[in-house]
Regions:
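Eukaryotic chromatin- and chromosome-associated nuclear factors
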Residues: 1-58
Length: 58
């Protein structure tokens, strides 16, 4: 997918983790990196990811 995709706080996205794509929401962003929360998981799983690991859901 294009690396110039723009993601915003509150966006519902898919995030790649160990070869699988998981539902997540962006809860913070600093431009290059995004803090995501995996839907249905505790906040201890929240992590900063680069745009390469994010895609918009179909």
């Amino acid at each position: 997918h294009p690396f110039n995709a723009v993601y915003s706080v509150g966006d519902q996205v898919k995030v790649e983790w160990k070869g699988s794509w998981w539902d997540a929401i962006i809860i913070e962003s600093n431009g290059e990196n995004h803090l995501i929360h995996y839907s249905g998981f505790e906040s201890s799983w929240d992590e900063w990811v680069t745009a390469e690991r994010i895609q918009k859901p179909n």
